[in-house]
Design a protein with these regions (language model features):
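Extracytoplasmic small-molecule ligand-binding "clamshell" domains
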Residues: 34-112
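Extended ligand-binding regions for polar small-molecule ligands
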Residues: 24-26, 73-82, 153, 160, ...
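Acidic, polar ligand-binding/catalytic clefts
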Residues: 81, 86-148, 217
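Short helix-initiation/N-cap motifs at beta->coil->alpha
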Residues: 73, 88-100, 141, 177-192, ...
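Bacterial lipoprotein signal-peptidase II cleavage site
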Residues: 6, 19-39
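Ligand-binding clefts/hinges and TM-proximal coupling segments of bilobed small-molecule sensing domains
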Residues: 25, 164-180, 217-219, 248-288
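Periplasmic-binding protein-like
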Residues: 54, 130-137, 202, 206, ...
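A ligand-binding cleft/hinge motif common to bilobed small-molecule-binding domains
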Residues: 112-121, 167-168, 191-192, 196-225
């Protein structure tokens, strides 16, 4: 495999995520003592502890020095600066984030987390990214659309909406679902022939494709609509209000567009014009 920018980030994140989970991560903030019993932060500290999973470039990953970085972290920093609080980031496994949030180990989650009515006891911010799901396959694959997944093995990251879609395919007798720990592992599994396709967030796939179009490709139309939000505990409406206010200001003052450009992401017009909120309301109404 070619040693290029994004694969270096992916492999670095894959090797280091276990270490990060154990020691608090490359970012000094990850080892903050603010994560106290019953509440990750206190009113007097003015610090919000944010859980993330740095295996998801360009939204959260590790740089060449092992520090956590990415669009979500920069966005959270911008929101915090606008609203007058500080943030500290804590690395953990993706499927442990909601549990950590509801037990007070962290105050918020910024980890490319999709709006999902099955996520209980939490509140989502307004959407900040249109991240529809797509199908990634090997560059020489003859899979051209979802219709071609019959009898195939389809991978996805455990705990994600992609995993829900893969599981639904298996339950329908269409394909075999293979749920793996993170997207890096899914990509490696695809490249080594362990699966035939990945259901993956399109912006993440596009970031990988920039340097690896000779290895993989996105195929067919977007598989399903998906949006990201920042997540807080259901009892923390005050923090949610600050996050939403800060997000609106960051979008309005142009900082949001700057961050999209920095991480080579398409500016999500549905977020800027408000139509993403309507789409999310429809998604979340499925729980009612």
């Amino acid at each position: 495999m070619k040693n290029k920018k994004w694969i270096a980030m992916l492999l670095t994140a894959a090797m280091a995520v276990t270490l990060l989970a154990g020691c608090g991560g490359g970012n000094d903030a990850a080892s903050s003592s603010a994560a106290a019993e019953g509440s990750a932060s206190s009113e007097s500290s003015n610090v919000v502890v944010v859980g993330t999973n740095p295996t998801f470039a360009p939204f959260e990953y590790q740089d060449d020095e092992g520090n956590m970085t990415g669009f979500d972290l920069d966005l959270m920093e911008a929101i915090a600066a606008d609203q007058g609080f500080e943030v500290e980031f804590k690395s953990m496994e993706f499927d442990a984030l909601i549990g950590a949030l509801t037990t007070g180990q962290i105050d918020a989650v910024a980890a490319g987390m999709s709006f999902d009515p099955k996520r209980n006891n939490v509140l989502f911010s307004d959407p900040y990214m249109d991240a529809s799901l797509g199908i990634m396959v090997a560059a020489d694959s003859d899979i051209a659309s979802a219709d071609d997944l019959q009898g195939k093995t389809v991978a996805a990251q455990i705990g994600t909406t992609g995993a829900d879609e893969a599981t639904a395919l298996e339950e329908a007798g269409t394909a075999t679902a293979k749920l793996l720990d993170n997207y890096n592992t899914c990509v490696q599994d695809l490249l080594t022939g362990g699966c035939d396709a990945i259901i993956i967030d399109i912006p993440v796939a596009q970031a990988y494709l920039k340097d690896h179009a000779d290895e993989v490709k996105l195929t067919g139309e977007p598989y399903a609509s998906d949006y990201y939000g920042i997540v807080v505990d259901e009892d923390n409406q005050e923090l949610l209000d600050k996050i939403n206010a800060g997000l609106a200001n960051v979008i309005e003052n142009g900082k949001f567009d700057e961050l999209c450009a920095k991480y080579e992401l398409d500016v999500p017009e549905s977020v800027k014009d408000g139509s993403a909120k309507d789409a999310v309301a429809e998604i979340m109404s499925a729980a009612e």
